[in-house]
């Protein structure tokens, strides 16, 4: 791999789990005019970012993003005891992603904002019937655009009892826990 890199004759995407290739050839590539980017999922502070929201063009792309995220966060060989929780968490995530995709400014279309929205919808007390800030956000959307696709998913998610909604939120938060880093 290194001899090919040192020829500096094309663009490269390199798998370098130990960081050895970067250490040995990174400075050379930069001196030859290459822009070296690192995606490090272990040390996120040393990593360039990837925002899949940038690539969302249509509703089908949003569906694929959520489906792929759930597939990639399911441990290999595991079987859901009750698919209700994952399906419901997926509906909530679809509501949030669709909302951001169609309603938020570009700089807010990211998973950090998804986590903020999820926290804004947190159900602290199951006896408290007041709407959460997230409920209010979707209520405003309903007033301006009652047929919005995000609302369709939010209504499906929000049709359960408070205890059920809290469990769905926890299921989704567990799936997205890496986005808290």
Regions found by a protein language model. Name each.
Residues 1-181:
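P-loop NTPase motor domains
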């Amino acid at each position: 791999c290194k001899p090919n890199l040192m020829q500096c004759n094309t663009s490269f995407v390199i798998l370098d789990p130990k960081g050895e290739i970067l250490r040995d050839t990174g400075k050379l590539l930069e001196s030859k005019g290459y822009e070296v980017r690192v995606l490090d999922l272990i040390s996120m502070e040393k990593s360039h970012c990837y925002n899949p929201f940038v690539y969302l063009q249509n509703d089908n792309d949003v569906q694929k993003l959520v489906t792929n995220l759930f597939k990639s966060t399911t441990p290999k060989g595991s079987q859901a005891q009750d698919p209700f929780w994952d399906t419901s968490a997926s509906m909530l995530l679809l509501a949030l992603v669709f909302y951001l995709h169609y309603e938020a400014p570009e700089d807010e279309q990211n998973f950090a904002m998804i986590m903020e929205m999820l926290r804004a919808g947190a159900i602290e007390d199951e006896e408290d019937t007041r709407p959460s800030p997230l409920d209010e956000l979707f209520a405003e959307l309903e007033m301006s655009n009652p047929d919005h696709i995000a609302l369709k998913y939010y209504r499906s998610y929000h049709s359960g009892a408070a205890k059920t909604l809290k469990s769905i939120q926890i299921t989704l938060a567990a799936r997205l826990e890496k986005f808290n880093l």
